[in-house]
Amino acid sequence: MATRPQDQWSLRIVNAETGTGKTTLLTILLGMMGKLNTDHRLLVATPFKDEASRLANDINRIAGTPTFAIAQHGEAKGAYTISGKYPCKVITTNAYIRALHDDERRETLYAYGQDEKRGLTIIDEALSPVSVYKMTADSASRIDAGLPEDIILEYGMAAHTLNEIKRARNEYLETGVASFLPFKLHKDTDRLLKAVQDSKEVNSEFKHEFENTVNMLRAYASDTSTRFVISEGRAHAFYAAQSEPILTVPAVILDATAELNLTYALLPKSKVQWVPIRPMRNYRNATLRVLMNIGTGKNAVGTNTDNKLNKLWRYTAKYRLEDIDTAIFSHLNTRDAFNELHKRETVRLDNNPRMSWGYYGKLNGLNEYKECHNLITASFPHQTEGWAISLFEALRGIQTEDWRKGKADRQFIDNNGREYADIVNAIRSSYYAYTIIQEINRIAIRKNVSADGDCPVVSIVHMWAADSLAFQALMAVKKTMTNINLVFDYGFSWEDSDASRLKKLLHVLTFTPPPYRMVATELVRNILEGEERDKADLATLKARREDPFADELKPTEITKPEVQKIWERLAKEISKNQIVAKKVLQAMKIDIRKSAGKPTLIVKS
């Protein structure tokens, strides 16, 4: 697409499914261009150093020459110049950013050809929707630079109220994790950066991440407006101070979840074209069991951690088959808590060769979990409304002083007429959806086992916050992974009491948006049937592993008498707290009456 000399588009976003071989096809394309000896000059940006080196070697192997592609991610001023000897340069996305913000090196990013028009820039896995950089308290404590102890980098958005900033500081002190987007440079940032670089106690990975973060901060703190697309744990700046994009040659971005990403909608329409690719994968052999629960965010296991993690481990045991590799994805601090339990032999994790760990922010594009047929997530990424507000405003550019001072008079409507609150909400829900899709596609589901694109039989157990935001994200996941087997399980709770279980059910029904009828149906079909359905699902899963294409093996259905029995049990539980339940039932268009002394639920229409 972008190799035509007179192409009018400066930027194309190619949206294809995770695991469909985008990088492989990119390698073949560039290798064949080298083999055919075209006059193109190519620049490729990819997230990781080792991947850049591997990509360059693979391109040369297909091109049949060792002098077509070269991986360069150093910091020398001429490191990014496209020379005649190596028509194709492969660099890291972070190196691309550094050169983009360096006046002396910016010109070297232009992949000019012989006629200064036939250049191509390809950015692999860059337009991921919005995350934040996180620093753990343990990492920060190893940096002895005499800096303030409360927080290293301060929030700088006037949109944050004083209480929001205080909450962020308290969050950092209590959990060791703080969200740093957007923000201003701390007065001691340069000293901190030097301390990090010189420290022998800080590992190289953290040094690399922190350096990239500081570079991002400097761009935010500049006097000019910089537009960012933030990837999982990394920042990618494609637009600088000018109103026009910096990319003056055709560029292509490959992204698996662009449809869920609000950022592409905020980019200049005259210079950006979104190119969706038809889905090619069939998820009919995958089962996603959603554990609906209150408080499944990153702090969900913060109190009474031992008991909570033990409960999660016991609960998911029935979905883990001993002869099947299992991946566990969580926050890094949750993993540390699991390891503490392991030391006391409460649970066994690290010594189990069939268990693989991964943590949020380090999963994008990885293939090391592709042999795992089970996936369990402990806790779930969560971002506050203040974070989404900050992100939206950061994408629009740095605000004026008048905007900062006049909070009551701000116009929260974008150029397309959409209300500001709707965009902020969509950004948050898209983050949920994007994260779970990326996680699921790390495991064996990314393989094809038939000509129809069927994936292997996999089982995913996922905790999900019981609120409307998570529900919207879940619908986005269902839309993207159309025929995945989705099972709601409201039976999981950190607490074991019946009172907390009922409270959770009412919370789910109160804050879950329409269609309420579907929620009620899933509630009936999954929570009150208990262990019998779990056993049936597990038996079906085992049978399908033996013959994944057996048409006669269908998920267990509930017969009409069983439905009536479940309705009666649900009515009995809700009737214990009719004051709270009245509003819920009205919203669901359900009456609760007593018949022969027993509570009964009546659907109005």
Q: What residue ranges belong to the model's regions?
A:
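ASCE RecA-like P-loop NTPase motor cores
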Residues: M1-S605
